[in-house]
C-alpha cells in the first residue's frame, strides 16, 4: 500500500499492474532521454559561436525529425494498446462479485455463494484500533481469492462512483443504470486499500475500499467470515 512521502507506484499485486509499472518506467526513460537531448540541443545552439547564413533548407534533417518522433510514438503506443486490451479481457472467471456504490459506502454481493450481501462502511476514528489506518479502515472487508480470475461487476445506486484498488491496477467507474465489469488475478495474499476515485458528494473522501486477499482453498470454504 501507499506510505508517506512515497514517490513511486505501489507494489504490484496482479499481472496487469506489473505490466503498467513496466510500461510507466519505459515511458519515463524515453521522456528523460528526449528531454535531455532537447536541452542539450538548446544549450549548444545558445552557446555556439559558429553560424552559417547560407543554409536555406536541410531536407535530411527535416526528414529525420519527422520520422524519429513518429517511431517513438509508435513504440510507446504499441505496449499501451496491449495493456489496454489486457484490462478488457474476460476469460472464464472463477468467481463473480458485485459491488454497488452508494453515498457513501459500498455494498458487496457474492453471487456464487447464494447471494450473500453486506455493506462496507468506513470506520470512524473512535472505533480504530492501534495500527489501523485513518479514513481507510472499514467494518466489513471484501474477501477475494488469489491465483484465480475474479470478475467484479460494478454499478451505482445513486451518483457516479469509481471502484479503485491501485495495487491491483483496478479502476472501474460505477455508473447508475449501467453494469461495468473488470477481471483481475491477484498474486499475493494481504490486505489492500483503495478509495472511491470519482467525486460523489460531500463525503466522497470517506468511502474507502478494503480488499483482503486469501488463498483459494480458504476462500472456497465460504466467504461468510467477512461479516
UniProtKB/Swiss-Prot annotation:
Entry's EC annotation: 7.1.1.9
Transmembrane segments: 15-45, 60-87
Subcellular location field: Mitochondrion inner membrane
PROSITE patterns: COX2, COX2_CUA, COX2_TM
Entry GO CC: mitochondrial inner membrane; mitochondrion; respiratory chain complex IV
Residues that hold Cu cation A1 according to the record: 161, 196, 200, 207
PANTHER family, per the entry: CYTOCHROME C OXIDASE SUBUNIT 2 (PTHR22888:SF9), CYTOCHROME C OXIDASE, SUBUNIT II (PTHR22888)
Assembly mode: Component of the cytochrome c oxidase (complex IV, CIV), a multisubunit enzyme composed of 14 subunits. The complex is composed of a catalytic core of 3 subunits MT-CO1, MT-CO2 and MT-CO3, encoded in the mitochondrial DNA, and 11 supernumerary subunits COX4I, COX5A, COX5B, COX6A, COX6B, COX6C, COX7A, COX7B, COX7C, COX8 and NDUFA4, which are encoded in the nuclear genome.
Name of the featured protein: Cytochrome c oxidase subunit 2
Species: Papio anubis
Amino acid at each position: 500500500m501507499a506510505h508517506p512521502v512515497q514517490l513511486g507506484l505501489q507494489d504490484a499485486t496482479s499481472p496487469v499492474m506489473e505490466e503498467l509499472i513496466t510500461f510507466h518506467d519505459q515511458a519515463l526513460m524515453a521522456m528523460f532521454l528526449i528531454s535531455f537531448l532537447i536541452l542539450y540541443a538548446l544549450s549548444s545552439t545558445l552557446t555556439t559561436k559558429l553560424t552559417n547564413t547560407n543554409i536555406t533548407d536541410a531536407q535530411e534533417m527535416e526528414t529525420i525529425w519527422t520520422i524519429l518522433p513518429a517511431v517513438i510514438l509508435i513504440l510507446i503506443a504499441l505496449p499501451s494498446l496491449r495493456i489496454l486490451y489486457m484490462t478488457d479481457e474476460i476469460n472464464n472467471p472463477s468467481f463473480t462479485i458485485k459491488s454497488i456504490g452508494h453515498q457513501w459506502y459500498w455494498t458487496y454481493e457474492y453471487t456464487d455463494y447464494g447471494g450473500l450481501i453486506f455493506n462496507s462502511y468506513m470506520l470512524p476514528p473512535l472505533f480504530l484500533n492501534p495500527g489501523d489506518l485513518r479514513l481507510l479502515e472499514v467494518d466489513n472487508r471484501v474477501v477475494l481469492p488469489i491465483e484465480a480470475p475474479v470478475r467484479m461487476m460494478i454499478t451505482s445506486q445513486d451518483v457516479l462512483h469509481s471502484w479503485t484498488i491501485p495495487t491491483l491496477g483496478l479502476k472501474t467507474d460505477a455508473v447508475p443504470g449501467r453494469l461495468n465489469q473488470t477481471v483481475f488475478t491477484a498474486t499475493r495474499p494481504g490486505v489492500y486499500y483503495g478509495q472511491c476515485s470519482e467525486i460523489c458528494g460531500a463525503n466522497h473522501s470517506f468511502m474507502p475500499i478494503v480488499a483482503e486477499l486469501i488463498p483459494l482453498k480458504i476462500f472456497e470454504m465460504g466467504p461468510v467470515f467477512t461479516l
